[in-house]
Curated annotation (Swiss-Prot):
Protein name: Ribonuclease kappa-B
Transmembrane segments: 13-33, 68-88
GO molecular function terms attached to this record: RNA endonuclease activity
Subcellular location: Membrane
InterPro entries: Ribonucl_Kappa, RNase_K
Pfam families, per database record: V-ATPase_su_f
Gene name per UniProt: rnasek-b
Natural source organism: Xenopus laevis (African clawed frog)
Amino acid sequence: MVSLLCCGPKLAACGIVLSVWGVIMLVLLGVFFNVHSAVLIEDVPFTEADMFEDPNPPAKMYRLYEQVSYNCFIAAAIYIVLGGFSFCQVRLNKRKEYMVR
């Protein structure tokens, strides 16, 4: 029978911890970008043309903030998937301990 086990117990536990931290961090960043936090303006990909040549500069900046927040939420979802994979690996490692060879 083919085993889906590809990680050891320590690597799987590390994957869970990193996934939980990544989800928390990225969701908080996504929320802060979504409310247009001024502290995070350095991380918004805008050019001088977006600020000075655009007839409605705040709308363009708000769209850029929201795009970055969506990217953070997508990355958090990917971390959730990887955390689920790590959790499955932990369960498979536990089951392997009880199997008789």
